[in-house]
Amino acid sequence: MIKKDYISLLHQMELVERGKSSGFLNLQEQKVLKQLLDKNHISYQVYSYFGHQDRVIYSKNRPKISLLEIMTDAQLTHQMLLGSFFALQIDSKILGDFLTYGGRYYMYIDSKYRDYILENFRQVGRNTITLKEVHLHDLEHYRPQFEEMTILVGSYRLDSIVSKITNYSRSKVKELFHDEWIRYMDEVVYSGSMIVKENDIFSIKKFGKYQVGIQKGKTKSNKFVLEIKKYMFLK
């Protein structure tokens, strides 16, 4: 973690200590902030929404969030939405995530910035959008959607798993790590030697975001039969 990000998390620690919200944090930020809070004996609660554990808020009290429906006739992708949102130069801690449910697009955000988002987030790519605040209960039955796959690997090394998903050679996979195409638990990693465990999350640029599932068994040749879940945005 670079110095400016660590300094930012020190500020988030102070906010939590004063009874305010940390904003939405990714997995790496969660790990560091938890260490800081525990080290300084600061009490906190962790709040997640819509089954997403990779974007949570640390706070002493339940924070207020707003759910906005994104109305458009265009077909949008998660990457399009993220790119257009952050083109507004908005702090990532304001946004929980973008979701799809029942053929509709949604986003959930820190309520303090609701009016600003309603006023300024009006376009995704070349497509005009309209935002409307809806009740959180509208998505009470929402759950993250996955495409499940089964792979055979000789070990739980991250590079072995990436090789199976991409069907790339070991040398090509090394290039992916070198070129910063791989993020593990929301941190860029340059080596695939780490051993992953169930529920760990990683992403491969241009391929998608994945979660390590259960071990389904072992083959006679002693390979692991491993479940991998790919996050799906549209259903």
Question: What residue ranges belong to the model's regions?
Answer:
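Ferredoxin-like alpha/beta domains used as RNA- or RNAP-binding modules
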Residues: 1-159, 165, 188, 201, ...
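Basic (Lys/Arg-enriched) interaction patch that binds polyanionic ligands
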Residues: 155-207
